[in-house]
Amino acid sequence: MTTWITICDTCKRDGWDQGDMALTDGERLATLIEAEAEGAVKTRRVSCLMGCARGCNVAIQSEGKLAYTLGDFAPEQEAAEGIVGYAKLHAESATGQVPYREWPQAIKGHFITRHPPLPSGK
């Protein structure tokens, strides 16, 4: 199954309006994640994951596996590397669960929710 990183491209962190405002913080993080993920996992952008109080937000998902929402990321390379690194581990896991000791440091403390897979069949 394909693992996807869904990236909120409308996220704006506190102080966003103090910068050049050419791009949202979500757009900046999305660009970094997309470059880091190329050829490893799939990415897509959506407008609003409704986690505005904890932006920048991403979701890591795959059919039949646990799904995770992560947030409170700065739009920086270290965050993108950690998110993609975790998504690769998620892809390798049969259930989507990754042992804590394997988590990239950059994603620790950023988990918001975990969703069980949807039931299959009827």
Mark where each language-model region is:
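Immediate flanking context of iron-sulfur cluster ligation sites
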Residues: 1-6, 30-51
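Generic detector of well-ordered alpha-helical segments enriched in charged/polar residues
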Residues: 30, 34, 81-88, 108-109
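Functionally engaged cysteine thiol sites
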Residues: 8-11, 48, 56
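Short Fe-S-cluster ligation motifs
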Residues: 41-48, 74-101
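Short flanking/linker segments adjacent to small metal-binding domains or redox-active Cys/His motifs
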Residues: 54, 59-65, 86-122
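Iron-sulfur (Fe-S) cluster-binding segments and ferredoxin-like electron-carrier domains
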Residues: 13-36, 55-76
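Polybasic, low-complexity association/targeting segments
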Residues: 1-14, 122
